[in-house]
């Protein structure tokens, strides 16, 4: 396969690697972008997370909650100017509230009735396009619910009540005090905003993702020239560290890095008055997956927590 300049540019943007390294990586992997990223990582040239968390699409994230259930939606617009428009912001809040009555899938939310117009959300968005004069779309949605407990929420870079650039839901099961439960839930939600864990527990991480990491670690370890039995131990150690870093409960708590999230939740059980189980998390970053200048969310959220 011919390696084009556009492919090299794309790989450079995703990895931060040099032009010649990117060109060689694409040549070695027959133009497969994901394989080229792994090739660069195996050579120690690119970081695993460089390609993720980039944003370009404008618009807003909206959140609506009702105690034991909450939803988060992403509505995209073409420009940030429209995202600051009162009519657009009201639309995002309205769609989030409608989403509360659905299972949280884009399909269900799109077909639900939007009270302000009596039409479906999908048709109401089309009407808004004609009125505001800019294309917009319901891109993503998620919902979490617990029978007994709370779904805590957090909006980062808030543009108003319930709307912003990053939204997080954290579902906590517990029979304890709901106010205290929501307090620790909000802290965990802020942590999720900062660290973007892949799953709550190591056992819940996608096996395909874990296998991909293992393969990269194997290739990196082989470069050491050590015997296979030593390489296996090295890889096992790096995989343990990988799981600790990407699973929520084993991560160092942003609010207090001296303890894990799991330890912080265990400590909160004293105030809540009952055991707490993290039943699920959801995190939507505006325009996630599309190129734009990156932000240090860990630093931003930590600063917001202290302020």
From Swiss-Prot:
Domain of life: Bacteria
Record GO terms (molecular function): translation elongation factor activity
Keyword Cytoplasm in annotation: yes
KW Protein biosynthesis (keyword) present: yes
Gene3D superfamilies reported in the protein's UniProt record: 1.10.286.20, DNA helicase RuvA subunit, C-terminal domain (1.10.8.10), Elongation factor Ts, dimerisation domain (3.30.479.20)
Main subcellular localisation: cytoplasm
InterPro entries cross-referenced by the UniProt entry: EF-Ts_dimer_sf (IPR036402), Transl_elong_EFTs/EF1B (IPR001816), Transl_elong_EFTs/EF1B_dimer (IPR014039), Transl_elong_Ts_CS (IPR018101), UBA-like_sf (IPR009060)
Annotated stretches, region: Involved in Mg(2+) ion dislocation from EF-Tu: 79-82
Pfam families with a match to the protein in the record: EF_TS
Keywords: Cytoplasm, Elongation factor, Protein biosynthesis
Gene Ontology CC: one annotated term: cytoplasm
Places the protein is found: Cytoplasm
UniProt similarity note: Belongs to the EF-Ts family.
Functional note: Associates with the EF-Tu.GDP complex and induces the exchange of GDP to GTP. It remains bound to the aminoacyl-tRNA.EF-Tu.GTP complex up to the GTP hydrolysis stage on the ribosome.
Identification of the protein by name: Elongation factor Ts
Gene: tsf
